[in-house]
C-alpha cells in the first residue's frame, strides 16, 4: 500500500510472486507513454509496445485444505505472500474473533473478550492457515473477524450458510470479500495480500518490495482495480519509479518507516489523477515480481493539498450571502449535494465543484436552505472493495441531524431560537485560570441515563434526557446540589455527542421500564427465547428481571441472559461509539429530529452551571470511529476519504483496531483539524469547560498540544485531561501518554493510586480478584483467605498511595518501604516510574470510574469474611479519602457516595439501566441483582458466588452514612487551600509523610502539610488514615497542641451519621493521636492567626 497525503498516502496491497511463464516476468522494454504523449514518464499512459510486459507467474491454484464436516464451518486465509516466501510462514499470532448475536447465532464457542487471541489456526499449508469452527447448527450464519493478535486483518464479516452451503469459505487479508473456495480467493488475491508501500510526500514512495529491483513502476486505473488481464498481463497505465533516499523530514514524520527503501515519482506526475483510482506498484527482477496496489489506501491526500485544505471551513456554513457547503474529498471522482425536505424527499441535487489546490468540493446556495436536510452523493474509489463506489453520506462537519443521524441539517448555532434565555451571559461557576484553581477541581463523572432513568421524582418524559437536570425538585438534582455545596466542583458527562449504537426511532426501542410485550415486538429473538412466555404476561421488563433475580445463580444466570436481549434494542450505551463528533446525541433529547437537541443540551448546561454551581466537562472520543468501510451505515469519514482518517497496518493495509473499533488517525493533519474544529464548537457554542480524552495515548502528543493551544485561544481557562495509557504507537509518533505529558499542564488519569488502593489491576479475573487486596480493602491488615500479599508488598502499596496523595510527582522525595530515600520516579509501578508528573494538576486521581467494577464491588470481592457491613462502608470512605485529601485533581464516579454497585459487572457499557442503576432515593445500591454479563464476567462467576452473600445488602442506613462520609471528605478538601496546592515545587516543600520505612506501622498513613508560616519548622501534622481492626496510636509528633479540623459538612451529615473518624479522635497533651479502625482524621495546629493541616 502506498502512503501519501497530509502525512502520506497509504496506497495499495503488496504481493510477492515467483516466476512468469515458468521463467521470466518481463519481455523487452521501452519508454512508457500515453496516447498523444508517448514517452512522458510523468503522465500515466498506455505502455509502449517496446516496454516491459509484466505477467503473472505460473503458480498452481490451490484446492481446499479441509472441508467442513457435520456441525462445522471452515475458514481458510489465503496468504499469497507466504506462498512465495523463501521461508515457511508463521501463523502463530493469527486468530479469529467470533461472536453470536440475535440474527447470527450458530457458533458453539464464541470468543468472550476482544483480548482473547486463543482461536489460533487448526492447521496450515503453503497457501495459508485455516480454522475448523464448531457449530450448534448448520443453518443461519456466523460473525467472524480475522486478526493478527488483536489487530484486524479483515473487518467484520458474516458467513451465511445459505450462501455457502458447504460451510467452507476463504478470505484474503485486507479484503472484506468472502469466497466460496480457496481457488476463487487465490485468483482474486494477486496484488491484494499486503499493503506495505507508502506515499509519504508528493514524489516519494517508500516500498520494501521495490528494493534492488531494476524495474519499478506505479500502475493506475481510474475505473477498476489494477489487475492482470485474461492473458495474465498488466496493461494499465503507469509511471516509472526511480530509487532515491529518505530525507530527514520524512524520517522524522514516519519513524516507523524510516528504514524502508525510497523511490521517486516523476516531478510532473499528475497526483490528482493517481488519487482518484486504483494504483499498483510493480517491481521485477530475475523473474520475481513484487506488486503493490497503492489505491488500496487513499490515506493521505497530499501535503500540498492539506496546507490549503486546513485553511478552509467545512460543513454547511451560513453567511450573509446564503449557505456554503464544503466537504474535503480529494480522492473523490465526483460529489453532489443532495437536498431533502422535512419528510426526506429529494428536493434537488447539485454537482459540487472541486478545488484542485485543496481537494475540497463546494457549492453555494441561498439562505432559504437554512433548516434543510442534506447529504453528499459520493463517487469514489474505495480500497476495501477495490472498486469505484457510489453512495450518499452525511456531513462529518454536521451541527444538526435528523432522527437516527440519517441526514445532516443546515443550522445556525447562533440562532436565538436555539438558546435558552440568558445563554449568552452564562459563565463557569469555578475559575480554571491558575494551577491553584485547577487543583480545587473535584470531578463527578456521570452518565445522562444513569442520572435520571430511575428517578421517579423526575417527570416521566424527561427521564434519561438532558432536561432531567432542570427538574429542580427531583431527588437527583437535590442530591447533586448537596454535593456541590460540600465541594464537588465539576460534572463530567460521559459521551453526549452523536452515538452510533442507540436507535433514536422510539418505535424501535424497548427499555426495561416498558411492557415486556414491547420488547417482544422490537426484538423478534425474544419470541424464540426461553423468555417468550412473558410476551403476553402484562409485566414490564423490569418486573420480569426482578422476578428472575430471586433465583439467579452462577449455574442459571437468567438475569444476564434476558438483559443481553434487552441490550440489543434499549436506549442504553455509554457512548464510546462516535457517529458524528459535533452534534449532541439525539436519544437524550425529547425530540431527536433536528434542532431540539441543540437547545435542550444548552438548557442542561445552563442548569448545571446556574442551579447546581458546577463546571461541565465533556468526554470526547476521537481515537476511533464506530465503523469504517464502504457499506456500514455508521461509517462516515471513511466513505468520504477512504482510509485517510483511519490508522492502517503498515504491511497489510487493514484498518487497525487496537482501541476497540476502527482506529482513527489523529496524526493526519486533516483529522487533527477536524478534532480541533469540533472542540472549538463544543467550547464556544456549548460552553464546555474541559475535555476528557478517551484513550488519549492513541493521539500524538503534538496533536493534543496543538488542539489545546487552539482551544485556549477561545477560552484561556479550558482544561484538557485524558487516559494517557501507553498505546504501543510510539514507533509512529510521540504519544500523548502520562510520562510524555509531564510539564505540559495536560492531565492524565493515574493508575498508580488506583491500583494501590483498590488492589490488583483492571484486568484481574477469577481468584485474582480476591487475592489482590489493596490499601482500601485490607492489604496487610485484614487479609482474606486467598491473599498471598506479603508485608513487603503491602508496604509498597502504601508507598504508591503516599506518592499518589502527593500528586504523583516525579521529583517528590519520600522514604520508601525499605527506608531508602527515593524520588517519585524511582518508586516502581509494574516496571514503570511510579511518579511521572511535574505538577499535581497533571494527575487525575481516582479509585472508581465508569470502567471496570465499582469501588463497592471491588471491596466486596476483596474484603475478608470477618469484615462486617459497617467496616466495608468505612473501607469505601477510607479509599475515597486517598483521592479527596490528596494533592492531585480529585475524580470519582457517579454513585460512589451511594455505595454504587453494578452487581460485579466489569464493563457495563451495554448492560443497560438494570445493572447501571443509581437510586437517588437512597434505598438500594443495586448490589446482587443478578450475575453480570457472561461474555465479560463468566470466568468470575465462581468467585462472585462465594463472596456476594458475605454481608447484608446495603440499605438506606448505609447509603445515608456513606453520603455523609462523602460530603465530609469533599468539605474537608474545600475547607483549606493546603489540600489543593496545585504547584509541584510547593507540594515538595510543604508535603511530607510520617510512619514510613521498614519499621512503619502497617495500615497507618500519616501525611503532613506545612502552611509555610514558619520556615524550617514543622507547622502541620499529618492527615491520618488508619486501616485495620483495632485502634491505632500514631507516634508523638513534633509539636503538641493539635486539634481536630472540623469540616462544615459534619453539621449536616445525612441521618445524623458519625464522621469518618467514628468516635472522636483522641489527641493527647503530648500530641500523640489515637484513631479508630478504618477512619480518617484531619488535625490542625493553630499558629498565630493561621492553621496548618495534618491529614490522614
UniProtKB/Swiss-Prot annotation:
GO MF, any single term: pullulanase activity
Localization annotation: Cell membrane
GO process terms (BP): carbohydrate metabolic process
Membrane topology summary: Lipid-anchor
Site (Transition state stabilizer): 851
Lipid attachment, kind N-palmitoyl cysteine: 20
Keyword line: Cell membrane, Glycosidase, Hydrolase, Lipoprotein, Membrane, Palmitate, Signal
Enzyme Commission number: 3.2.1.41
Lipidation (S-diacylglycerol cysteine): 20
Annotated signal sequence range: 1-19
Region Disordered: start-end pairs: 24-50, 1014-1044
CDD domains in the cross-refs: AmyAc_Pullulanase_LD-like (cd11341), CBM41_pullulanase (cd10315), E_set_Pullulanase (cd02860)
GO cellular component terms given for this protein: plasma membrane
PANTHER family the UniProt entry points to: GLYCOGEN DEBRANCHING ENZYME
Protein name, as recorded: Pullulanase
UniProt lineage: Bacteria, Pseudomonadati, Pseudomonadota, Gammaproteobacteria, Enterobacterales
Amino acid at each position: 500500500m502506498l502512503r501519501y497525503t497530509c502525512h502520506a498516502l497509504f496506497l495499495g496491497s503488496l504481493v510477492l510472486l515467483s516466476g512468469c511463464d515458468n521463467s521470466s516476468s518481463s519481455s523487452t522494454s521501452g519508454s512508457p507513454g500515453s496516447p498523444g504523449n508517448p514517452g512522458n514518464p510523468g503522465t500515466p499512459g498506455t505502455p509502449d509496445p517496446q516496454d516491459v510486459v509484466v505477467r503473472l507467474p505460473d503458480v498452481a491454484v490451490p484446492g481446499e485444505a479441509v472441508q467442513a464436516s457435520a456441525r462445522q464451518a471452515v475458514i481458510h486465509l489465503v496468504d499469497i505472500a507466504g506462498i512465495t516466501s523463501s521461508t515457511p510462514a508463521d501463523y502463530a499470532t493469527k486468530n479469529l474473533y467470533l461472536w453470536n448475536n440475535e440474527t447470527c447465532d450458530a457458533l458453539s464457542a464464541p470468543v468472550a473478550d476482544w483480548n482473547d487471541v486463543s482461536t489460533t489456526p487448526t492447521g496450515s499449508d503453503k497457501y495459508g492457515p485455516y480454522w475448523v469452527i464448531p457449530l450448534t447448527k448448520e443453518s443461519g450464519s456466523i460473525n467472524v473477524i480475522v486478526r493478527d493478535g488483536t489487530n484486524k486483518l479483515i473487518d467484520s464479516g458474516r458467513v451465511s450458510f445459505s450462501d455457502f452451503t458447504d460451510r467452507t469459505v476463504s478470505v484474503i487479508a485486507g479484503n472484506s470479500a468472502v469466497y466460496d473456495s480457496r481457488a476463487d480467493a487465490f485468483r482474486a488475491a494477486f496484488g491484494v495480500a499486503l499493503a506495505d508501500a507508502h506515499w509519504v510526500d508528493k514524489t516519494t514512495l517508500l516500498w520494501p518490495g521495490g528494493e534492488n529491483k531494476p524495474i519499478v513502476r506505479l500502475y493506475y486505473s481510474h475505473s477498476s482495480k489494477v489487475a492482470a488481464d485474461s492473458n495474465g498481463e498488466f496493461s494499465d497505465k503507469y509511471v516509472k519509479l526511480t530509487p532515491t533516499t529518505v530525507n530527514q523530514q520524512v524520517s522524522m514524520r514516519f519513524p516507523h518507516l524510516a528504514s524502508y527503501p525510497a523511490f521517486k515519482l516523476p516531478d510532473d506526475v499528475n497526483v490528482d489523477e493517481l488519487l482518484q483510482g486504483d494504483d499498483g506498484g510493480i517491481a521485477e527482477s530475475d523473474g520475481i515480481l513484487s506488486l503493490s496496489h497503492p489505491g488500496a489506501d487513499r490515506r493521505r491526500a497530499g501535503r500540498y493539498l492539506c496546507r490549503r485544505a486546513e485553511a478552509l471551513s467545512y460543513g454547511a456554513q451560513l453567511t450573509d450571502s446564503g449557505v456554503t457547503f464544503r466537504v474535503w474529498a480529494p480522492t473523490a471522482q465526483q460529489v453532489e449535494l443532495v437536498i431533502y425536505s422535512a419528510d426526506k424527499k429529494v428536493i434537488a441535487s447539485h454537482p459540487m465543484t472541486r478545488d484542485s489546490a485543496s481537494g475540497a468540493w463546494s457549492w453555494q446556495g441561498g439562505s432559504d436552505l437554512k433548516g434543510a436536510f442534506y447529504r453528499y452523493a459520493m463517487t469514489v474509489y474505495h480500497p476495501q472493495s477495490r472498486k469505484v463506489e457510489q453512495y450518499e453520506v452525511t456531513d462529518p462537519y454536521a451541527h444538526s441531524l435528523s432522527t437516527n443521524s440519517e441526514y445532516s441539517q443546515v443550522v445556525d448555532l447562533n440562532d436565538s431560537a436555539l438558546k435558552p434565555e440568558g445563554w449568552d451571559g452564562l459563565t463557569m461557576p469555578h475559575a480554571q485560570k491558575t494551577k491553584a484553581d485547577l487543583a480545587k477541581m473535584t470531578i463527578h463523572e456521570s452518565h445522562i441515563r444513569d442520572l435520571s432513568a430511575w428517578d421517579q421524582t423526575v417527570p416521566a418524559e424527561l427521564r434519561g434526557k438532558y432536561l432531567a437536570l432542570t427538574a429542580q425538585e427531583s431527588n437527583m438534582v437535590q442530591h447533586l446540589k448537596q454535593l456541590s455545596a460540600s465541594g464537588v466542583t465539576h460534572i463530567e458527562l460521559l459521551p453526549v455527542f452523536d452515538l452510533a449504537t442507540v436507535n433514536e426511532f422510539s418505535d424501535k426501542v424497548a427499555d426495561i421500564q416498558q411492557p415486556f410485550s414491547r420488547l417482544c415486538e422490537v426484538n423478534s429473538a425474544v419470541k424464540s427465547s426461553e423468555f417468550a412466555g412473558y410476551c403476553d404476561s402484562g409485566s414490564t421488563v423490569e418486573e420480569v428481571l426482578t422476578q428472575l433475580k430471586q433465583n439467579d445463580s452462577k449455574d442459571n444466570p437468567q438475569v444476564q441472559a434476558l438483559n443481553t436481549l434487552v441490550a440489543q434494542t434499549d436506549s442504553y450505551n455509554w457512548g464510546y461509539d462516535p457517529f458524528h463528533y459535533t452534534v449532541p446525541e439525539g436519544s437524550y433529547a425529547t425530540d431527536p429530529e433536528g434542532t431540539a437537541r441543540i437547545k435542550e443540551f444548552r438548557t442542561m448546561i445552563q442548569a448545571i452551571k446556574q442551579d447546581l454551581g458546577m463546571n461541565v466537562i465533556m468526554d470526547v472520543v476521537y481515537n476511533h470511529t464506530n465503523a469504517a468501510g464502504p457499506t456500514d451505515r455508521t461509517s462516515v469519514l471513511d466513505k468520504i476519504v477512504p482510509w485517510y482518517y483511519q490508522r492502517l497496518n503498515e504491511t497489510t493495509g487493514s484498518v487497525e483496531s487496537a482501541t476497540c473499533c476502527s482506529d482513527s488517525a489523529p496524526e493526519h493533519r486533516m483529522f487533527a483539524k477536524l478534532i480541533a474544529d469540533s472542540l472549538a464548537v463544543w467550547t464556544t457554542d456549548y460552553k464546555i469547560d474541559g475535555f476528557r480524552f478517551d484513550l488519549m495515548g492513541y493521539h500524538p502528543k503534538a496533536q493534543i498540544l496543538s488542539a489545546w493551544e487552539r482551544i485556549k485561544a477561545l477560552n484561556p481557562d479550558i482544561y484538557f485531561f485524558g487516559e494517557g495509557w501507553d498505546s504501543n504507537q510510539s514507533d509512529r509518533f510521540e504519544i500523548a501518554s502520562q510520562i510524555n505529558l509531564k510539564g505540559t499542564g495536560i492531565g492524565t488519569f493515574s493508575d498508580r493510586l488506583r491500583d494501590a488502593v483498590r488492589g490488583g489491576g483492571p484486568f484481574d479475573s477469577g481468584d485474582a480478584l480476591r487475592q489482590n487486596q489493596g490499601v482500601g480493602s485490607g492489604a496487610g491488615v485484614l487479609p482474606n483467605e486467598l491473599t498471598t500479599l506479603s508485608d513487603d508488598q503491602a508496604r509498597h502499596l502504601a508507598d504508591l498511595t503516599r506518592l499518589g496523595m502527593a500528586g504523583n510527582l516525579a521529583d517528590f522525595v519520600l522514604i520508601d518501604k525499605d527506608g531508602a530515600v527515593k524520588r517519585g520516579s524511582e518508586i516502581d509501578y509494574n516496571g514503570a516510574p511510579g511518579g511521572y508528573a511535574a505538577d499535581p494538576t497533571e494527575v487525575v486521581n481516582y479509585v472508581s470510574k465508569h470502567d471496570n467494577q465499582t469501588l463497592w464491588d471491588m471491596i466486596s470481592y476483596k474484603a475478608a469474611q470477618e469484615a462486617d457491613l459497617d467496616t466495608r462502608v468505612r473501607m469505601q470512605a477510607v479509599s475515597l479519602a486517598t483521592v479527596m485529601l490528596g494533592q492531585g485533581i480529585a475524580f470519582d464516579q457517579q454513585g460512589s457516595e451511594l455505595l454504587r454497585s453494578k452487581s460485579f459487572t466489569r464493563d457495563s457499557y451495554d448492560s443497560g439501566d438494570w445493572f447501571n442503576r443509581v437510586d437517588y432515593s437512597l434505598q438500594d445500591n443495586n448490589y446482587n441483582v443478578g450475575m453480570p454479563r457472561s461474555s465479560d464476567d463468566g470466568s468470575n462467576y465462581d468467585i462472585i458466588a462465594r463472596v456476594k452473600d458475605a454481608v447484608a445488602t446495603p440499605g438506606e442506613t448505609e447509603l445515608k452514612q456513606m453520603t455523609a462520609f462523602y460530603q465530609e471528605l469533599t468539605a474537608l478538601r474545600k475547607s483549606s487551600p493546603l489540600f489543593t496546592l496545585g504547584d509541584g515545587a510547593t507540594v515538595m516543600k510543604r508535603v511530607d509523610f510520617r510512619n514510613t520505612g521498614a519499621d512503619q506501622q502497617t495500615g497507618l498513613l500519616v501525611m503532613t502539610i506545612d502552611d509555610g508560616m514558619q520556615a524550617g519548622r514543622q507547622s502541620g501534622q499529618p492527615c491520618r488514615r488508619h486501616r485495620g481492626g483495632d485502634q491505632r496510636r500514631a507516634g508523638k509528633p513534633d509539636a503538641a497542641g493539635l486539634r481536630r479540623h472540623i469540616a462544615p459538612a459534619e453539621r449536616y451529615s445525612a441521618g445524623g451519621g458519625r464522621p469518618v473518624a467514628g468516635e472522636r479522635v483522641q489527641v493527647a497533651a503530648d500530641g500523640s493521636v489515637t484513631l479508630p479502625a478504618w477512619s480518617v482524621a484531619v488535625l490542625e495546629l493553630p499558629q498565630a492567626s493561621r492553621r496548618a493541616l495534618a491529614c490522614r
